[in-house]
Amino acid sequence: MPIKQTINPLERLVVGVATGTLTMSEIAKFMEGVMSARATRYRKLIDVTDCIAGFGEAEVAAFAQVLSNARKDRQYGPLAIVADPKRGELAHLFTTLAGEGLSAKTFRSIHDARAWLSEQSVSDN
């Protein structure tokens, strides 16, 4: 099932909620939406508590490389992932995709994730 996406320019916040089986193509569509809205520098909150991974480590590695290449000319804002601790592979996926040098953190509660994001700065550029 796709990631439901909400982009709020006033708050400079992107919220994604995934349910069902999450595939790499759905993650790619989510990222395309963020990029086309010019919201890469916004804070991002992704809730994956109600989904399961529909991909393997090889797909994650390949997709992370694509994102790394695309990131070279863009600024990225902080990323908060809300995940079920029993399904840590999804949290690991998003922190892997965030890559080095980007601020990403995993939370058990959406409230803690929002609190952390509110403390993070976002570029105006």
Functional labels for PLM-detected ranges:
Residues 1-125:
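Amphipathic, Lys/Arg-enriched alpha-helical "gate/interface" segment within cytosolic domains
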